[in-house]
From Swiss-Prot:
Its main location: cytoplasm. The gene is lysS. It is an enzyme of class 6 (ligase). This is Lysine--tRNA ligase. It catalyses: tRNA(Lys) + L-lysine + ATP = L-lysyl-tRNA(Lys) + AMP + diphosphate. One of its GO terms (molecular function) is tRNA binding. It is found in: Cytoplasm. Binds 3 Mg(2+) ions per subunit. Its EC number is 6.1.1.6. Its cofactor is Mg(2+). GO terms for biological process: lysyl-tRNA aminoacylation. Mg(2+) 2 binds at residue 415. The keyword Metal-binding applies.
Length: 496
């Protein structure tokens, strides 16, 4: 709570401010909307902070700013206060001799009130750029007190529930979401520069597909049919490649009815893209170029500090198969142990890791990888050769049909991207869908449905294609050194 009401609780402050608003209304205050801002605080600071005090006085620079009062010092017949706009803060100097009526009103305004200020720039004796107010106008009366300026919102969950207050009080939060916006803009620039077409595909699907995940279910009243919030746009984007759009991308939300953690949110943002006449090796090269561009454009560095360690995007990204990664981080494991179901079961039993009796060799290998290796992949790393049995939409390897031409991209121990050469054999895809249906019937809630319309689209002919999905929320976490995915989502879902 602000220093003006340190001895009052929030309800008492709210009551006092409501009374002030009632008095303002009696005097004709009606939340005016005629003041026009012409300058932002940060732009003025950048332009004039280095200007000498005497030179600035000779220039007679007139400005018009607006923002929220976040600090004020009333000193008899003169006061200083800071206003905060989207770009930053600037100081204002107000004298009773210049504006006696306004000054008397100002003494009754509160931190959090939004004002418009017109005046002339000058520098104080300490060198701080300041506006000598010639006109000050109350634009919005704030009824609720701001958090303490030194501590902000101390309750982390309250930050998520009342993000609007967090953004007022916490400069780091504002920076996080500005970086998020700049990152998404940079994604679009890179995709557009590489001749990809941005498209929009349905958010409600008659058949969930495109990923192994549990969907949210809803009902379309007019059509009287069950619909599913999309878990991935993949099958619709590939339909567009069938239709002749050879490079497409979409930045949008996906929804998965699964657990919440520091790395998972049921509603999340993805960049997903597809390129005809390319394979997964092309996409790994493309991804390296993309991440170099994002680092240069958004952060102006290719070395990022995350949770006390440095991620180096300058070096070539390491590429390891699933088996190679297991052997690298488990030097005691022999390669032949990974080649049989019994060998993998023994390894998992020794480590105390659960598995199902129905899990095949590939699934057992992935359990071992995900539970013991994934978290150790701190530097940018591509993991390749994912088993066919867990990759129902990916093309089989020409050299080993038990694995696919697929990669997952890891940074700081978490999956950031998933890409592969697309399966464009309609008969093979239909058979894999049938196996997914068998798994669903056996109780796997994340297994895929059989999508006959997608099979029909493949039967028209999908050119050789590669596709990739990149998790934007997790990438923002890295770029902003954030510990939780909820720190980078403006309004994350919370338990009521």
């Amino acid at each position: 709570m602000s220093e003006e009401h340190v001895h009052l609780d929030e309800s008492e402050v709210y009551h006092i401010r409501k009374q002030k608003l009632a008095e303002l209304r009696t005097g004709g205050f009606n939340f005016p909307n005629t003041f026009r801002r012409e300058h932002l605080a940060d732009a003025l600071l950048k332009q004039y902070s280095e200007t000498e005090k005497q030179t600035l006085e000779q220039k007679h620079v007139k400005v018009s700013v607006a923002g929220r009062i976040v600090l004020r010092r009333i000193m008899g017949k003169a006061s200083f206060f800071h206003i905060q706009d989207v770009s930053g803060r600037i100081q204002v100097y107000l004298r009773s001799n210049d504006l006696p009526d306004i000054y008397e009103q100002f003494k009754h305004w509160d931190l959090g009130d939004i004002v418009g200020v017109q005046g002339e720039l000058f520098k104080t004796n300490t060198g701080e750029l300041t506006i000598n107010a010639e006109h000050v106008e109350l634009l919005t009366k704030s009824l609720r007190p701001l958090p303490d300026k030194f501590h902000g919102l101390a309750d982390q969950e309250l930050k998520y529930r009342k993000r609007y207050v967090d953004l007022i009080a916490n400069e780091d939060s504002r920076k996080t979401f500005l970086i998020r916006s700049h990152l998404i803009k940079a994604f679009r620039e890179f995709m557009d520069d590489n001749h990809f077409l941005e498209v929009e595909t349905p958010m409600m699907h008659p058949i969930p597909g495109g990923a192994l995940a549990r969907p949210f279910v809803t009902h379309h009243n007019t059509l009287d049919m069950t619909m599913y919030l999309r878990i991935a746009p993949e099958l619709y984007l590939k339909r567009l490649v069938v239709g002749g759009f050879e490079r497409v991308y979409e930045i949008n939300r996906n929804f998965r009815n699964e657990g919440i953690s520091t790395r998972h949110n049921p509603e999340f943002t993805m960049l997903e893209f597809y390129q005809a006449y390319a394979d997964y090796n092309d996409l790994m090269n493309f991804t390296e170029q993309l991440f170099h561009y994002l680092c240069d454009k958004v952060l102006a560095t290719r070395q990022i500090e995350y949770q006390g360690q440095v991620i180096d995007f300058n070096k070539p990204f390491e590429r390891l198969s699933v088996k190679e990664a297991i052997l690298k981080y488990h030097p005691d494991i022999k390669a032949q142990q990974l080649e049989t179901v019994e060998g993998c079961r023994t390894l998992l039993n020794d480590l105390g890791l659960p598995y199902k009796e129905t899990d095949g060799l590939g699934k057992l290998q992935i359990i071992l990888f995900e539970e013991t290796v994934e978290h150790q992949l701190f530097q940018p790393t591509f993991i390749t050769e994912y088993p066919t049995e867990i990759s129902p939409l990916a093309r089989r390897s020409d050299t080993n049909p038990e694995v696919t031409d697929r990669f997952e991209f890891f940074i700081a121990g978490r999956e950031i991207a998933n890409g592969f050469s697309e399966l464009n054999d309609a008969e093979d895809q239909a058979e894999r869908f049938r196996k997914q249906v068998e798994e669903k019937d056996a109780g796997d809630l994340e297994a895929m449905h059989f999508d006959s319309d997608y099979i029909e689209a493949l039967e028209y002919g999908l050119p050789p294609t590669a596709g990739e999905g990149i998790g934007i929320d997790r990438l923002v976490m890295l770029f902003t050194n954030s510990q939780s995915i909820r720190d980078v989502i403006l309004f994350p879902h919370l338990r009521q």
